[in-house]
């Protein structure tokens, strides 16, 4: 029987976020990345979404390690939740380890977790796998791709990347090593598809610094900059521009404060001397000497920028003349919330500069020409497009064919697909359990499809509670039912409807004989629920959640 290497995406396909891929060879497994996704607008009460790791739980004795490409939430956000079910060592670069450690501390997992830091250019032996760390450029420091070596051959897993010839930290992507791997022979390439729809090259991060200088030099008022907290190089450029323009910088927002602490302690950010001040002290400076760096680039409701916009931030109040710079583009799905914050900032008299107006943000993902370079350098026998929605995966497949690949050597899978590679062929050989697990407060996985459906229904049509006072002995209805509504109608203006609902509920209850009413609450509740629901839809064309409550007296 021919040897097989299995590639099993558990997240990140046909979606943006919750990236996770398992590699299986010789009866052993390694996992690459462990990310979360933001909940959709219809996921009421959900904090985040993580991959379903049922397959990994069933096979946890075969797992040899979790390897992390970089420290973005869509690659590390699920780690604490998964570690509570699967104890496995984590291998990552130093900066990524610093961010993961914050999560482990928050979940009291530091002592029970083996966290190993690995430098780019080094390799780790994990059972029958040898995983080589290769430096790449991305919108967060210390990002890597992996060359996953097995006796069958080498898989190059790019993670998120771009080709930046002028990176802020001076560390360019290791194209030389990728080229060497191509010469040695790459069995399969698994590559980022996020920006495959965009032609050309992604601009260098350094271009944003020039924009900051121009915006700072042409402003005599306070400047507030919001960006992704994880983009250390972006924040570094804000600090540098502020220092050159004689301004002080204060930081607000929990994730931004944590990121500043980790990046400065580990040496990934260098704060110009006498530039950083406490957020409580900066308001004592002249407006033209102030810069505030904040979270909230995605319009998150509890973020610092959101609270500034809606006048609930304790230290910062937006006023006329303030210049607010949004140095980030909205993640797909967040456009409405970002727009709401921008509108409120304008309403308060601020000047808002955002991506459409200037070169204030550049992507951290490779565009078409960069992807072609990676394909040309690695010369893979097989190809699996990762990290993207269906159209992105399909376009990446077309790009690979333009580079000369045989369509039969390309696999476009779904989350849970088992992509099997032998030395000569590739196929999707079945699937494993995969999907979404909802995190709601401290609950993980206890909110399923039925609960989400009920929450959606409550949010859209409200709730009607019908309280039925029933005599315990003979089942007689002791009084007219009490009707309680929430989120359905304004009761004071709907007296006729409320009276009619009482009659409908009484008629339904009367349809159940007294003897049955005295013994069977279930049948009574079912009859009342059906009658009230039908009446409401017929007369209002709405379907609130109807909850009959039987009270025995």
Give residue spans per PLM region.
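C-terminal tails and terminal domains of large nucleic-acid-associated
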Residues: 517-553
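Conserved hydrophobic residues forming the short capping helix/wall of the S-adenosyl-L-methionine
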Residues: 104, 400, 536
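Solvent-exposed loop and beta-edge segments used for protein-protein assembly and interaction
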Residues: 15, 140, 286, 458-460, ...
């Amino acid at each position: 029987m021919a040897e097989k290497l299995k590639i099993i995406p558990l997240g990140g396909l046909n979606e943006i976020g919750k990236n996770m891929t398992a590699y299986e060879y010789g009866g052993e497994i390694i996992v690459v990345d462990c990310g979360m996704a933001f909940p959709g607008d219809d996921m009421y009460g959900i904090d985040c979404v993580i991959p379903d790791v049922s397959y990994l739980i069933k096979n946890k004795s075969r797992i040899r390690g979790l390897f992390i490409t970089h420290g973005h939430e869509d690659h590390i956000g699920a780690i604490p939740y998964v570690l509570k079910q699967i104890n496995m060592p984590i291998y990552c670069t130093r900066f990524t380890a610093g961010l993961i450690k914050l999560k482990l501390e928050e979940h009291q997992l530091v002592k029970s977790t083996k966290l190993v830091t690995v430098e780019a250019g080094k390799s780790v032996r994990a059972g029958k796998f040898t995983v080589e760390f290769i430096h790449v450029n991305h919108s967060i420091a210390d990002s890597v791709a992996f060359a996953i070596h097995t006796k069958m051959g080498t898989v190059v897993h790019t993670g998120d990347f771009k080709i930046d010839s002028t990176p802020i930290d001076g560390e360019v992507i290791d194209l030389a090593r990728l080229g060497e791997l191509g010469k040695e022979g790459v069995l399969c390439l698994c590559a980022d598809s996020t920006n495959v729809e965009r032609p050309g090259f992604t601009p260098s991060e350094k271009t944003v610094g020039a924009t900051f200088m121009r915006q700072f030099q042409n402003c005599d008022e306070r400047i507030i900059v919001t960006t992704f907290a994880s983009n250390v190089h972006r924040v570094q450029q804000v600090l540098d521009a502020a220092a050159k323009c004689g301004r002080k910088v204060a930081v607000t927002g929990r994730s931004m404060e944590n990121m500043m602490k980790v990046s400065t302690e580990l040496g990934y950010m260098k704060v110009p001397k006498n530039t950083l001040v406490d957020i409580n002290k900066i308001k004592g400076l002249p407006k033209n000497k102030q810069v505030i760096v904040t979270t909230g680039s995605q319009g998150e409701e509890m973020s610092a920028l959101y609270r500034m916009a809606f006048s609930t931030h304790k230290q910062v109040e937006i006023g006329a003349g303030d210049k607010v710079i949004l140095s980030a583009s909205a993640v797909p799905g967040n456009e409405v919330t970002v727009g709401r914050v921008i509108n409120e900032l304008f309403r308060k008299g601020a000047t808002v500069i955002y991506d459409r107006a200037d070169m204030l943000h550049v992507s951290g993902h490779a565009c078409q020409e960069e992807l072609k370079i990676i394909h040309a350098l690695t010369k893979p026998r097989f190809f699996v497009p990762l990290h993207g929605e269906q159209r992105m995966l399909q376009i990446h497949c077309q790009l690979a064919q333009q580079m000369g690949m045989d369509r039969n050597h390309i696999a476009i899978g779904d989350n849970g697909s088992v992509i099997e590679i032998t030395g000569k062929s590739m196929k999707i050989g079945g699937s494993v359990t995969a999907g979404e697990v909802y995190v709601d407060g401290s609950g993980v996985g206890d909110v399923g499809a039925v609960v989400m459906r009920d929450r959606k229904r409550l949010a859209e049509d409200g709730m009607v509670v019908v309280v039925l006072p029933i005599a315990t002995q003979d089942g007689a209805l002791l009084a007219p039912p009490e009707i309680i509504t929430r989120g359905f109608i304004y009761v004071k203006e709907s007296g006729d409807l409320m009276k009619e609902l009482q009659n409908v509920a009484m008629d339904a209850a009367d349809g159940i004989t007294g003897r049955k009413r005295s013994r069977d609450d279930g049948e009574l509740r079912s009859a009342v629920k059906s009658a009230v629901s039908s009446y409401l839809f017929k007369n209002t064309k709405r379907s609130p959640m109807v909850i009959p409550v039987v009270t025995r007296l």
